[in-house]
From Swiss-Prot:
Molecular function per GO: 3-isopropylmalate dehydratase activity
Protein family (similarity comment): Belongs to the LeuD family. LeuD type 1 subfamily.
Record field: catalytic activity: (2R,3S)-3-isopropylmalate = (2S)-2-isopropylmalate
Keyword annotations: Amino-acid biosynthesis, Branched-chain amino acid biosynthesis, Leucine biosynthesis, Lyase
Name of one Pfam family that matches: Aconitase_C
Class of this enzyme: lyase
Name of the encoding gene: leuD
Biological process annotations from GO: L-leucine biosynthetic process
HAMAP family for the chain: LeuD_type1
Domain of life of the source: Bacteria
One GO location term (cellular component): 3-isopropylmalate dehydratase complex
Residues in the signal sequence: none
Role played: Catalyzes the isomerization between 2-isopropylmalate and 3-isopropylmalate, via the formation of 2-isopropylmaleate.
Protein name, per record: 3-isopropylmalate dehydratase small subunit
Length: 201
């Protein structure tokens, strides 16, 4: 079972860039591991650090600003997560501490991978995202509330509705990944296997 996602209130960091690809999110030299942990240290490595080893923070990159330390909601521009289909991208984002990414659009594979890893991708219109960027930039350190049950983002004095597939919403609300979904039908699977002819077992 994965962690259930119903509602999250968190600090918002504005990444004012479109077409952020998966190689920028987690560069290929850090993909040797097959476990989900440890990737957060290398999130946006080529942007966050001035050296290849990740020891000299880039003071001009937004994630390194003092006011955004501990951010758990990432605000981005269109086509977030484009490029190769590596699942390491949502792994890196969640391992860093992000729970939500808000953008006008997402690459399809990244969008699906995010749900599989309990990272909520929230799609709002370009105009709404523009409003949110202005709000965050005028109020560094602001928090948003993201309510998956009600399907709304509460930011300042405004509330923004977002759409999400019913099945994906159900899975996130109940903390169900592919393994959890399978285990829901464990009894039926066992019953089916018992009925198989012996030579098929």
């Amino acid at each position: 079972m994965a962690e259930k996602f119903t509602q999250h209130t968190g600090l918002v960091v504005p990444l004012d860039a479109a077409n952020v690809d998966t190689d920028a999110i987690i560069p290929k030299q850090f993909l040797q591991k097959v476990t989900r942990t440890g990737f957060g240290a290398h999130l946006f490595n080529d942007w966050r650090f001035l050296d290849d080893k990740g020891q000299q923070p880039n003071p001009e990159f937004v994630l390194n600003y003092p006011e955004y330390q501990g951010a758990s909601i990432l605000l981005a521009r269109e086509n977030f997560g484009c490029g190769s289909s590596r699942e390491h991208a949502p792994w890196a984002l969640t391992d860093y501490g992000f729970k939500v990414v808000i953008a006008p659009s997402f690459a399809d594979i990244f969008y699906g991978n995010s749900f599989n890893n309990q990272l909520l991708p929230v799609t709002l219109s370009d105009e709404q995202v523009d409003e949110l960027f202005k709000l965050v930039q005028a109020n560094p350190g602001i928090t948003f509330e993201v309510d998956l049950e009600a399907q709304v983002v509460k930011a300042g004095d405004k509330t923004y509705s977002f759409k999400i597939d019913d099945f994906r919403r159900h899975c996130m609300l109940n903390g169900l990944d592919s393994i959890g979904l399978t285990l829901q039908h464990e009894a039926a699977i066992s019953d089916y296997e018992r009925k198989l002819p012996a030579f098929m077992n």
